[in-house]
């Protein structure tokens, strides 16, 4: 095995939070450590996963939410130490891997059907 792959796997195992299985279309709540001035606090960010990038230690995912009528997107590194926890709120039933078309939609048109097990 490659030395770099071994080092990346060790870094992933030392990650302080567990990463649940989630896919594009799922609504996810991410608790992120934020530094404001001299103090740190945990800030929640809840949104729909519109993209997921699987690259081992360099994996990331993009969340989109609407805040006060304005669309907000944020990219998170999956194994970042800034992330306190990741929770899946609901599963979405979509057919695409990237949901960039949601950027042009708003209101009821941007709804995602819930996956029924």
UniProtKB/Swiss-Prot annotation:
Single GO term (MF): structural constituent of ribosome
PANTHER family reported in the protein's UniProt record: LARGE RIBOSOMAL SUBUNIT PROTEIN BL19M (PTHR15680:SF9), RIBOSOMAL PROTEIN L19 (PTHR15680)
Keyword Ribonucleoprotein listed: yes
Entry function: This protein is located at the 30S-50S ribosomal subunit interface and may play a role in the structure and function of the aminoacyl-tRNA binding site.
UniProt xrefs under InterPro entries: Ribosomal_bL19 (IPR001857), Ribosomal_bL19_sf (IPR038657), Translation_prot_SH3-like_sf (IPR008991)
Alphabetical keyword list: Ribonucleoprotein, Ribosomal protein
Pfam families named in the record: Ribosomal_L19 (PF01245)
Gene Ontology terms: cellular component: cytosolic large ribosomal subunit
GO biological process, one term: translation
Organism: Halorhodospira halophila (strain DSM 244 / SL1)
Similarity comment: Belongs to the bacterial ribosomal protein bL19 family.
Species classification: Bacteria, Pseudomonadati, Pseudomonadota, Gammaproteobacteria, Chromatiales
Protein name as catalogued: Large ribosomal subunit protein bL19
Gene: rplS
């Amino acid at each position: 095995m490659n030395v770099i792959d071994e080092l990346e796997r060790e870094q992933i195992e030392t990650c302080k939070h567990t990463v649940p299985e989630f896919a594009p279309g799922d609504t996810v709540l991410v608790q992120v450590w934020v530094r404001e001035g001299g103090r740190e606090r945990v800030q929640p960010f809840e949104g729909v996963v519109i993209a997921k990038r699987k690259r081992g230690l360099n994996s990331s995912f993009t969340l989109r939410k609407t805040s006060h009528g304005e669309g907000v997107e944020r990219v998170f590194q999956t194994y970042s130490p800034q992330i306190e926890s990741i929770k899946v709120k609901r599963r979405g039933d979509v057919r695409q891997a990237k949901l960039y078309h949601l950027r042009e939609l708003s209101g009821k048109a941007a709804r995602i059907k819930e996956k029924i097990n």
